[in-house]
Swiss-Prot record:
Region (Disordered): 804-833
Family the entry assigns: Belongs to the DNA mismatch repair MutS family.
Official protein name in the record: DNA mismatch repair protein MutS
NCBIfam families xrefs: mutS1 (TIGR01070), PRK05399.1 (NF003810)
Keywords: ATP-binding, DNA damage, DNA repair, DNA-binding, Nucleotide-binding
Organism: Teredinibacter turnerae (strain ATCC 39867 / T7901)
InterPro entries cross-referenced by the UniProt entry: DNA_mismatch_repair_MutS, DNA_mismatch_repair_MutS-lik_N, DNA_mismatch_repair_MutS/MSH, DNA_mismatch_repair_MutS_C, DNA_mismatch_repair_MutS_clamp, DNA_mismatch_repair_MutS_core, DNA_mismatch_repair_MutS_N, DNA_mismatch_repair_MutS_sf
GO (cellular component) term, any one: cytosol
Taxonomic placement: Bacteria, Pseudomonadati, Pseudomonadota, Gammaproteobacteria, Cellvibrionales
UniProt keyword DNA-binding present: yes
Residues that bind ATP: G621, P622, N623, M624, G625, G626, K627, S628
């Protein structure tokens, strides 16, 4: 807590009762901004006010004094609070929402207030605060030595999972995969900067990660003796992380977490490992600029539902090594392609809302009326999906059909209970339909019939009193009244009681009108209370079916993704990959799924073969010739196959890979103090230390960040290690043409190159993969395309000619440049004999006399 509040707490009597109440509440929430409800505003005080004014761009004012100094204050209107909360959550700031729970009209002193919820980046469930296209992960991390336990919770859907991994590299990879909104970790745990510096990082006390405490709290939640039924036997640190995460979730939500119905234990051995560099380089769902444009996800995502889009993103980031699941997904895609069934399914899915998050809000008792309307409309679609799935004669789709259960009772109940277009919130009523509840209809009838009563009373009183200016009215301040003009006011009957004097009229009340007023106003209040009670009963009734509804929502999301795969297979001309028992990758006319969609010209497809006899391809060719595209398309085709999708090729046969590694592109890490070359070597080290014979490795331009000798030596050694020791399936792109000599020594290494041709001093890229090494790099032609000045190109051409003809003496200097370019010998070029060597080659030592030998020494000395 800030120092000001701490000082103030010592002398609470110096403050007003209201501020004393605030300070006590703030003391319980030192790490959150406290939104303190005062009438129509949420107010913030002291350092909270200063911080909010800066982050939210609201006015910083003052209220009263503390120790003689004005108390800083800022506020936001309660009706617009969601917008401000959304901004704070995106900035990684947590907020405690303190509401008035007492009645100001009947309370002496400060109105009773209580923190009703704590909004944190990882625990939000409100629709306005969430990105519908992304999971919102709350992650807890615990550790013992080099082992990390990770627990993940998506509060919106109730998805809860745990797993254990080894080493910091694996931890960074998982954080990159999950991209959590909030991270909980022990205060004293040392974590990599890439984890600890994330927005939303929260240090927590060590005791919150106690394994035994975590186990007890989770068993209590799931009402089980142990967690073996969830597959948790053998887990240790992950249970400590899960216990902390669960306690934190309960603390922030202030209600039961009934939508957390299961705990999933993820097994890293069942998935393809993708490190952080690979996810970045392959641009799976975020491109190198940080947006979704031109990513694999953007090309594949034609899902009809928000929850389907989120599941697609998870699948893309978690390719599988489970053949049963992959074959199951493939069979569903094939069935949905039959007779264009996917088109009919997609039309129905478009009417289904974000059920996962709607059900999460229902469980947390924070669902709004329109959530229930969307649920009703979604459940009404289920019967239309059933025949489409059951007629497919596909086991996978039949299973989904059984899980997408029909809920006729709930549909009928919701349809009867809700008006067609309910208001956003229940606060003002108007949500429950007429005819649903007799008591509510009666109370509403009193208010509705008030107009008729007033007209009737006005007519009656005019006739009885003979006062033609008499009229009956109502306003919120004074309630119901009888108004008579000044000129006739003195003739008012004795039973008329004066209520208000106006400039031109007097207003009265009568015992009869007062009785009606009490009844009408009471009826309105009672009707609103009754409506809120009925709404809460609806929520409870839905919670009774929560688990079945959640299962159906998960099945709908899976159907949506499989249907999207079918639609994409049809639209993009994708084919079903064939999985084989033996290791290897064979692709016929493969295409890059993203680049193909961006190009205006036809994409040039290429073949690829990697097997036991050919485990590595050394790829040479000009820059812009397509080396990186060819490498990335191979990785994306393999990844798509192991997601269960069809792939962009004419045919694809492969064995399962366990990991995909990429070392492509150049970037530094200035924040971490690492140069471009250091980043390159760190990524290379990760590959060499972790790749296996079942891994796919892409390495591009290893060694270019240092001198020619160092770089070439490193590249050479990497090729040998990958080919001879690791035996990984490798695509190795390089500009070191000396590397192309290695296939002569390493039988499983082959040369290929990207074809190009030269026409009138210009380069034409053919983008075709050909056997053998490239004949030249076309570097000067690419430089010309890039706009390098002509004078520089002419000088470079002169230098190149002298180097290629074996005359590395300095070329004539350019007028504007007096320094001579330094030349570096080709490490593996055939050495040219010197004059001394040539002279010695003609000498027969045994034929020389001592004098001739001495003369030869003098002769050779002159040649040096």
């Amino acid at each position: 807590m800030n120092q000001e509040v701490k000082q103030s707490e010592v002398n609470l009597e110096q403050h007003t009762p209201m501020m004393q109440q605030y300070l006590r509440i703030k003391a319980q929430h030192p790490n959150e901004l406290v939104f303190y409800r005062m009438g129509d505003f949420y107010e913030l005080f002291y350092e909270d006010a200063r911080k909010a004014a800066k982050l939210l761009d609201v006015t910083l004012t003052a209220r009263g004094k503390s120790n003689g100094e004005p108390i800083p204050m800022a506020g936001v209107p309660y009706h617009a609070a969601e917008n401000y909360l959304a901004k704070l959550v995106k900035l990684g700031v947590s907020v405690a929402i303190c509401e008035q729970i007492g009645d100001p009209a009947t309370t002496k002193g400060p109105v009773e207030r209580k923190v009703m919820r704590v909004v944190t980046p990882g625990t939000v469930s409100d629709e306005a605060l969430l990105d519908e296209h992304r999971d919102n992960w709350l992650v807890a991390i615990s550790a013992h030595e080099s082992q990390f336990g990770i627990a993940c919770l998506d509060m919106g859907s109730g998805r809860f999972s745990v797993f254990e991994i080894e080493g910091e590299d694996a931890l960074i990879s998982e954080i990159e995969r999950l991209r959590p909104a909030e991270i909980l970790a022990p205060d004293l745990l040392t974590l990599p900067p890439g984890v600890r510096n994330k927005a939303g990082y929260r240090g927590r006390p060590e005791w919150e990660f106690d394994i035994e405490s975590g186990l007890r709290s989770l068993c209590a939640h799931f009402a089980t003796k142990d967690l073996d039924g969830f597959g948790c036997r053998g887990l240790t640190v992950a249970l400590g992380a899960a216990g902390c995460l669960y306690a934190y979730a309960k603390e922030t939500q202030r209600t039961e977490l009934s939508h957390i119905a299961s705990l999933v234990v993820e097994n890293p051995d069942n998935t393809v490992s993708l490190d952080a560099a690979t996810r970045r380089n392959l641009e799976l769902d975020i491109n190198l600029n940080g947006s979704e444009e031109n990513t694999l996800f953007s090309v594949l995502n034609t899902t009809a539902t928000a929850m389907g889009g989120r599941l697609l993103r998870r699948w893309i980031n978690t390719p599988l090594r489970d053949l049963h699941t992959l074959h199951s997904r493939q069979s569903a895609i094939a069935a949905l392609l039959e007779n264009y069934r996917f088109e009919q399914v997609q039309q129905e899915l478009k009417h289904i809302g974000d059920l996962e998050r709607i059900l999460g809000r229902i469980a947390l008792r924070s669902a709004r009326p329109r959530d229930l309307t969307r649920l009703l409309n979604s459940l009404a679609i289920y019967p239309q999906l059933q025949p489409l799935l059951k007629s497919a004669e596909c086991e996978t789709l039949a299973t989904l059909a059984s899980e997408i259960n029909e809920f006729p009772g709930l549909v009928q109940e919701l349809d009867k209970a809700l008006v067609e277009n309910p208001p956003v919130v229940i606060r003002e009523g108007g949500v429950i339909a007429e005819g649903y509840d007799e008591e509510l209809d009666e109370l509403r009838g009193i208010s509705t019939n008030a107009g008729e009563f007033l007209v009737k009373l006005e007519t009656q009183e005019r006739e009885r009193t003979g006062l033609n200016t008499l009229k009956v009215g109502y306003n919120r301040v004074h309630g119901y009244f009888i108004e008579i003009s000044k000129s006739q006011a003195e003739k008012a009957p004795a039973e008329y009681i004066r209520r208000q004097t106006l400039k031109n009229a007097e207003r009265f009340i009568t015992p009869e009108l007062k009785t009606f007023e009490d009844k009408a106003l009471s009826a309105k209040s009672r009707a609103l209370s009754r409506e809120k009670a009925l709404y809460e009963q609806l929520i409870e009734k839905l919670n009774e079916h929560l688990r079945e509804l959640q299962i159906s929502a998960v099945a709908v999301a899976e159907l949506d993704v499989l249907n999207t795969f079918a639609e994409r297979a049809h639209a993009l001309k994708l084919v079903k990959p064939e999985f084989r028992g033996e290791a290897g990758i064979e692709i016929e006319k493969g295409r890059h799924p993203v680049v193909e969609q961006v190009l205006t010209d036809p994409f040039i497809p290429n073949d690829l073969t990697l097997n036991a006899q050919q485990r590595m391809l050394i790829i040479t060719g000009p820059n812009m010739g397509g080396k990186s595209t060819y490498m990335r398309q191979t990785a994306l085709i393999v990844l798509l196959a192991q997601v269960g999708s069809y792939v962009p090729a004419e045919a694809c046969r492969l064995g399962l890979v366990d990991r995909i590694f990429t070392r492509i592109g150049s970037s530094d890490d200035l924040a971490g103090g690492r140069s471009t070359f250091m980043v390159e070597m760190t990524e290379t080290a990760n590959i060499l230390n972790n790749a296996t014979s079942d891994s796919l490795v892409l390495m591009d331009e290893i060694g270019r960040g240092t001198s020619t000798y160092d770089g070439l030596s490193l590249a050479w050694a990497c090729v040998e290690h990958l080919a001879e020791k690791l035996k990984s399936f490798t695509l190795f792109a390089t500009h070191y043409f000396e590397i192309t000599a290695l296939p002569a020594q390493l039988p499983t290494v082959k040369n290929v190159h990207l074809d190009a041709t030269e026409y009138q001093d210009n380069i034409v890229f053919l983008h075709n993969i050909q056997a053998g090494p490239a004949s030249k790099s076309y570097g000067l032609q690419v430089a010309k395309l890039a706009g390098i000045p002509g004078a520089v190109l002419r000088q470079a051409k002169d230098v190149l000619h002298k180097l290629e003809t074996g005359k590395p003496e300095s070329p004539a200097p350019v007028a504007s440049r007096s320094s001579k370019p330094s030349m570096q010998a080709d490490m593996f070029a055939e050495p040219q004999p010197s004059k001394v060597e040539k002279r010695l080659a003609t000498v027969i030592p045994d034929d020389l006399s001592p004098r001739q030998a001495l003369e030869l020494v003098y002769e050779l000395k002159k040649l040096i």
